[in-house]
Amino acid sequence: MKQVCILGNGQLGRMLRQAGEPLGIAVWPVGLDAEPEAVPFAQSIITAEIERWPETALTRELARHPAFVNRDVFPIIADRLTQKQLFDKLNLATAPWQLLASADEWPGVFDRLGELAIVKRRVGGYDGRGQWRLRATETAQLPDDCYGECIVEQGINFSGEVSLVGARGHDGSTVFYPLTHNLHQDGILRTSVAFPQANAAQQAQAEAMLGAILSELNYVGVMAMECFVTPAGLLINELAPRVHNSGHWTQNGASISQFELHLRAITGLPLPQPVINSPSVMVNLIGTDLNYDWLKLPLVHLHWYDKEVRPGRKVGHLNLNDADTDRLSATLEALVPLLPPEYASGITWAQSKLL
């Protein structure tokens, strides 16, 4: 039996473990503070569900492990500075940017990047945290500790957000899912919609960009690339060197889920192109109590993470997929009264994509 240890034991590790069971792969998600002797890592392949981690007895041990897949890639992608430098090195389209070294640079920043600046911490920060949207009169609100530790990007006037989830095998072969349309609110992914066939030009551009990144990094496994849709084409926003929230629809909408695909890639199993037969919608459950009435709707697949429910916390997701988009839209409509009011706008957005 193949064994995989996952650095991190959140919902991504949980879903990787679930995906491993039918394949006969024993998957062990482990907390960062676990005692090394309690973790069966000696004969395991090592992967991670997070981009960065503190130094602990376990992480020190795993950092030396010869089968830690992509070990040297995580630091590059975890730092937005080196991630942006990678895009520039490969001549890949991304928002104009620079390192923000001191407050003295602000006049030049707005001259170069325009009236809206997006400031992001180089490391950490996700789901909208550690980011600021600033105009020239608002720079005083940026914490002093950001200077030297943040990048600043041009605010992009985009018409939509999409992501590409793909995987690369040890032999260099790559496979990709269709582009996923994503709706973020307050920086948090709320809803995703995917179709068997994406826009051909966008799909080709996205695959070329992510393929170049995977090859340059000699990456193995699943990676996600988030992009802005603009009149000139796609601009890369950020990378995630792991399975990704916007790929959760693949659990019920693809012949091979992103979780199974990642395990196949890192363990050297066959990596065929996943087949997608019908449109899919994913609704993130954020700070919402479990409601089994969702399951009264026959298209709904519930994925509950068994986490304490807190405001702003991802605690599960709902997947829906059906070849009949009218039936899919009607099921979304039936979900509205079963969810808190803040879900209505995301469901309306998904329905508009299905038209």
Model-inferred region functions:
Residues M1-Q85, D104:
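ATP-binding N-terminal substructure of ATP-dependent carboxylate-amine bond-forming enzymes
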Residues A204-M225, T230, P241-T288:
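Active-site "cap" helix and flanking loop/linker of ATP-utilizing ligase/carboxylase catalytic domains
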Residues A78-S163, A167-I213:
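Active-site nucleotide/adenylate-binding loops and adjacent lid/helix of ATP-dependent enzymes
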Residues G166-H170, C227-P231, D306:
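Short, low-complexity Ser/Thr-rich regulatory SLiMs
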Residues G187-P196, E238-Q251:
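Short, flexible active-site loops
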Residues G233-L235:
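Conserved protein kinase catalytic/activation segment
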Residues R264-L355:
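Peripheral (often C-terminal) accessory segments that flank ATP-dependent C-N-forming ligase machineries
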